[in-house]
From Swiss-Prot:
Homodimer. One of its GO terms (biological process) is fatty acid biosynthetic process. It is found in: Cytoplasm. The last Arg residue of the ACP-binding site is essential for the weak association between ACP/AcpP and FabH. It catalyses: malonyl-[ACP] + acetyl-CoA + H(+) = 3-oxobutanoyl-[ACP] + CO2 + CoA. Keywords: Acyltransferase, Cytoplasm, Fatty acid biosynthesis, Fatty acid metabolism, Lipid biosynthesis, Lipid metabolism, Multifunctional enzyme, Transferase. The active site is at C113, H248, N278. It holds the Pfam family ACP_syn_III_C. Belongs to the thiolase-like superfamily. FabH family. Residues 249-253 are annotated as: ACP-binding. GO terms for molecular function: 3-oxoacyl-[acyl-carrier-protein] synthase activity; beta-ketoacyl-acyl-carrier-protein synthase III activity. This is Beta-ketoacyl-[acyl-carrier-protein] synthase III.
Length: 321
């Protein structure tokens, strides 16, 4: 059977770090308030010369280097973002041009914080059809550009960044590296719980992020538990078989709840929310690359990715690294 295996990963962060103390000087909040409710201690914020595309390019170059392959061998680029450089063309085409992957398929997907899971499943499907042999799957965001910096309930939660993986199609059995199972879902009836109040078709403005946090949390815990069970059932494995869970880094409380639902110790959960905050579509690949590079995630490990975002959208993928 054809399997899409992760051959390398990379990530990128803006230069500027913003601490909770610095935010407390701007809005009515404190380090203690933010840490207690979210687990976040700092975040990275893009400068005037840093964009979703430039972060994506840096993460992609590192992923290609880690995979030991050259850009011209990439057949497909799928970039997940809710904060593209432009309404069009796709930010993926900017990455394609910068890397020199001339002529390859390149497009964006938009599923907010679930975007990387949607992009990964899309690339996996295209590789299995034979339409492409190697793919770059990227999650990249500059969420700082759509935040209301007067709203302390949301501006403290998010940061900017990018993560990328190289996928390669190869024959393999269930023990070989590759994506074992994926599930995606959406529920548009909940769109007004997490959204941006602007857009080119409605207000002709970018708008700002709006969120009803308690309701989002309640839905997230249930939806993520359900989709994780679906993926485990599809793959024919149990939660105890998982070596690592790489969740969307929304906040520490959701990460704790996910671990409890799976019956896993927090030691098996990759946590970067304290350093990176919520980087939306970049969150999962950024956390994955962090854990690969610091030696936690090793070849052969069984890794679960999961995320939920505005829409609502949510999904999970089980990967043999």
């Amino acid at each position: 059977m054809i399997r899409a295996a992760i051959k390398g990963s990379g990530s990128a962060l803006p230069r500027k770090v913003v601490t909770n103390e610095e935010l407390a000087a701007r809005v009515d909040t404190s380090d203690e308030w933010i840490v207690e409710r979210t687990g976040i201690r700092q975040r990275y914020i893009a400068g005037a010369d840093e964009f979703t595309s430039t972060l994506a390019m840096e993460a992609s170059r590192k992923a290609l280097e880690a995979a030991g392959i050259t850009p011209e061998t990439i057949d497909l680029i799928v970039l997940a973002t809710a904060t593209p450089d432009n309404t069009f063309p796709a930010t993926a085409t900017k990455v394609q041009e910068a890397l020199g992957c001339n002529g390859c398929i390149a497009f964006d997907v938009q599923a907010v914080c679930s975007g990387f899971l949607y992009a990964l499943a899309t690339a996996d499907s295209l590789l299995k059809t034979g339409m492409a042999k190697r793919a770059l799957v990227i999650g990249a965001e500059t969420f700082s550009r759509i935040l209301d910096w007067e709203d302390r309930t949301t501006c403290v939660l998010f940061g900017d960044g990018a993560g990328a993986v190289v996928l390669e199609a190869a024959e393999g059995d269930t023990e070989a590296p590759g994506i074992l199972a994926s599930r995606l879902h959406a529920d548009g009836a909940q769109h007004d719980l997490l959204y941006v109040d602007g857009g080119p078709s409605t207000t002709q403005t970018v708008g700002h992020l709006r969120m009803r946090g308690r309701e989002v949390f309640r839905h997230a815990v249930v939806n993520l538990a359900d989709v994780l069970k679906e993926v485990l059932d599809d793959a024919g494995v149990s939660a105890s078989d998982i070596d690592w869970v790489v969740p969307h880094q929304a906040n520490a409380r959701i990460l704790d709840a996910t671990a409890r639902k799976l019956g896993l110790p927090m030691e098996k959960i990759v946590v970067t929310v304290d350093r990176h905050a919520n980087t939306s579509a970049a969150s999962v690949p950024l956390a994955f690359d962090t854990a690969v590079r610091d030696g936690r995630i090793k070849p052969g490990d069984l890794v679960m990715f999961e995320a939920m975002g505005g829409g609502f959208t949510w999904g999970a993928s089980l990967v043999r690294y």
